[in-house]
Amino acid sequence: MKITDILTYAAAGILAVSSQAKDVHSPDGRFAVRAEATISLIDSSGNQILTLVRDTSGDAKVEVAWSPDSRHVVVVENGERVGSGIVAAWKDEVWHKTIESESQEGALIQAQQAKFHGRLVAEHRKLDGWKSPSEVLVQGDMTFSSGGNYHYGYTLAFRQVPGRLDRGGYEEGQLIGKDYHSL
């Protein structure tokens, strides 16, 4: 695990950390995301509520963003080599966890591979602040084997709809990418 500098974006409510025992507290101070060998949601006493990510060994950077109302949190994992993943949690009466579906970005990747005449070789994303208490802005970069690069952005929105649990305990269909655009 590479140790990255801690970068605070106070206005956006975003903190980038290495996975070395860093707690990123919610604005109300009642919860935190703890990044260690795993990424967990904890309460103010340090008791684990949810495991968001079971293994951070391939992560170069973990970025955490709490919504201003402390009811939503988004975590971006950027790998040391190729890609990134986004997991999140939200609270109604209890905490739930969800994951951004890879199929959502699949059409974008296929279109850009055709445009740049090469396969995707690297992809990284970062958070760009909260648009609303349940929508966060995301920016991404794709690099293709042809040498081309594509910079893009989109909105990641929480949806409160009945879903099903996948094998990892994530509620599917709760985190939706929309408004994809070039930067």
PLM features per residue range, with description:
Residues 5, 18-25, 94-98, 105-183:
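Acidic, small-residue rich beta-repeat scaffolds with periodic aromatic anchors
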